[in-house]
Amino acid sequence: MRLFLSLPVLVVVLSMVLEGPAPVQGAPDVSSALDKLKEFGNTLEDKAWEVINRIKQSEFPAKTRDWFSETFRKVKEKLKINS
């Protein structure tokens, strides 16, 4: 009975060994992942610089600076008058 059960097990084990290693199925390649990450970083950097340059060229910073200067000047004058 033991021989009768061990022969099929031996056949299955031999077939698995002779079959060889299983093909790689979608194992991520580290270099391609790093390349994608680098590309994402470069894209993000370009977009960030574009936004910064757009803000620098807009009128908003100048208007904000002028508003703060004017408000600060008015507060300063009020404090001088009240003192």
Swiss-Prot record:
Keyword terms, alphabetized: Lipid transport, Secreted, Signal, Transport
InterPro entries on file: ApoC-1_sf, ApoC-I
What biological process terms from GO does the record include?
A: lipid transport; lipoprotein metabolic process; negative regulation of cholesterol transport; negative regulation of lipid catabolic process; negative regulation of very-low-density lipoprotein particle clearance; triglyceride metabolic process; very-low-density lipoprotein particle clearance
Q: Which cysteines are joined by disulfide bonds?
A: none
CC terms in the record's Gene Ontology section: high-density lipoprotein particle; very-low-density lipoprotein particle
Tell me the first and last residues of the signal peptide.
1-26
* Keyword Transport among record annotations: yes
Q: Where in the cell is it found?
A: Secreted
Query: Coiled-coil ranges per the record?
Result: none
| One Pfam match | ApoC-I
Where does the protein principally reside? Answer: secreted
Which Gene3D superfamilies has this protein been placed in? Apolipoprotein C-I
What does the record give under GO molecular function?
fatty acid binding; phospholipase inhibitor activity
Protein task: Inhibitor of lipoprotein binding to the low density lipoprotein (LDL) receptor, LDL receptor-related protein, and very low density lipoprotein (VLDL) receptor. Associates with high density lipoproteins (HDL) and the triacylglycerol-rich lipoproteins in the plasma and makes up about 10% of the protein of the VLDL and 2% of that of HDL. Appears to interfere directly with fatty acid uptake and is also the major plasma inhibitor of cholesteryl ester transfer protein (CETP). Binds free fatty acids and reduces their intracellular esterification.
Q: Which family does it belong to?
A: Belongs to the apolipoprotein C1 family.
An additional note in the Swiss-Prot or TrEMBL entry is: Apolipoprotein C-I is present in acidic (APOC1A) and basic (APOC1B) forms in P.paniscus, P.abelii and P.troglodytes and perhaps also in baboons and macaques. The two genes for ApoC-I arose through a duplication process that occurred after the divergence of New World monkeys from the human lineage. In human, the acidic form has become a pseudogene sometime between the divergence of bonobos and chimpanzees from the human lineage and the appearance of the Denisovans. Pseudogenization resulted when the codon for the penultimate amino acid in the signal sequence was changed to a stop codon.
Protein name (database record): Apolipoprotein C-I, basic form
